[in-house]
C-alpha cells in the first residue's frame, strides 16, 4: 500500500515539474513575441515575399494575406514560405494584428 502511495506521489511531482517547465517556456515565448511585434509594426511583407512560417500571419501585408508554407516545409531546407492570399477567415484572424493600420483603409 505504501509503495502505491509513494509511486503516486512521485508521479504527481514529475507531472508538476513538467508543467512548470512548460509554463517557463510559454513565458519565454511570450517575451519573444512581444519583441517580434515591434518588428511587425515597422514592416509588412508584400504579397509573394518570403515570410517566416514560425511567426504570425501579421507579417504579410493585407487583410487577406497569410504566410503559406509548402507541405512538410519544416523538414526540407530548401522549402520557403511565401505571403499568399488566404480565405475570408484570414482577415478576421488578422484583426488583432498590431500593424493592421498599414493595410486598413
From Swiss-Prot:
Signal peptide residue numbers: 1-17
* Cystine bridges: 51-67, 58-97, 60-83, 69-81
Propeptide position ranges: 18-41
Q: Give the chief site where it resides.
A: secreted
Q: Which InterPro entries match?
A: Toxin_34
Q: Does the keyword Transmembrane apply?
A: no
Q: Which family does it belong to?
A: Belongs to the neurotoxin 04 (omega-agtx) family. 01 (type I omega-agtx) subfamily.
| Record's protein name | U2-lycotoxin-Ls1a
Which organism is this entry from? Lycosa singoriensis (Wolf spider)
Q: What is the lineage of its organism?
A: Eukaryota, Metazoa, Ecdysozoa, Arthropoda, Chelicerata
